[in-house]
């Protein structure tokens, strides 16, 4: 063990290995089998998942992935690699003995394998940074579960720090604000990934974090209450999810006199299928077809300098 080397584990959701039906099916099976994501009784849910959902959804989702796939592969993985390298470069410039690894809750590279690489490199401490600014049991807690699994075969568990959330971190808020320049008569819509309403009732304070993030950004930009709103996207299944829903809101705004909209997905640290296809394409078409005149998607923070600096400072506070 190198007593001076610090390990950093960047963690995100994950992606299929390739945009094919078999690869997407494997990915969705792992993702949707996580009880943190879907907490229905296991036997009942596995029957529904294997015999009703995967066969229908996998080809459709694979087609959507093919539309956003790049030469570097999945946008989420490519951008996450850029974030990993940018943070490694940052710590190298600071002459800090820090090793940054990347792991995904589902798919490759896994959080378990990233944890193993850090331990084999001899780090004396691991700082786990889930790239989810707003805590949720469906995302952040899944990272903790996977990290714990990565330690199960270790005789010596090194000390670790787990960054729970950073929804109100000043540098993160400033990084978001720096990407937003509203045009005249343009309304700002914060679209966060949804979760079942029941999860909030049972104690998940994710929606509170989302509202706080949006309010802080709006305050930073000196926006009035009429200039912005919060919605939730990507609902799945028949259960009620957090509302208002992004798609329904965008379809009704033009009839309420809102003709110009800018959409930012502040909970996504990297652009992915949900932002590049669902928000930037599908919902744009719906808004314009409903009578909207201008629709602008503001990209995720990805590997931009302000974002990397904000993440680096979060990590440095734990070193």
Swiss-Prot record:
Matches recorded under PANTHER family: FERROCHELATASE, FERROCHELATASE, MITOCHONDRIAL
Main location (coarse class): cytoplasm
Classification via CDD domains: Ferrochelatase_C (cd00419), Ferrochelatase_N (cd03411)
Protein localization: Cytoplasm
Keywords, in A-Z order: Cytoplasm, Heme biosynthesis, Iron, Lyase, Metal-binding, Porphyrin biosynthesis
HAMAP family, alphabetized: Ferrochelatase (MF_00323)
GO biological process, one term: heme biosynthetic process
Encoding gene, per UniProt annotation: hemH
Function: Catalyzes the ferrous insertion into protoporphyrin IX.
Annotated pathway: Porphyrin-containing compound metabolism; protoheme biosynthesis; protoheme from protoporphyrin-IX: step 1/1
One Gene Ontology term of the molecular function aspect: ferrochelatase activity
InterPro entries from the UniProt entry: Ferrochelatase, Ferrochelatase_AS, Ferrochelatase_C, Ferrochelatase_N
Family: Belongs to the ferrochelatase family.
Protein name as annotated: Ferrochelatase
Domain of life: Bacteria
Ligand binding (Fe cation): 193, 274
E.C. code: 4.98.1.1
Catalytic activity reported: heme b + 2 H(+) = protoporphyrin IX + Fe(2+)
One cellular component (GO) term of this entry: cytoplasm
A Pfam family assignment: Ferrochelatase
Annotated source species: Actinobacillus pleuropneumoniae serotype 3 (strain JL03)
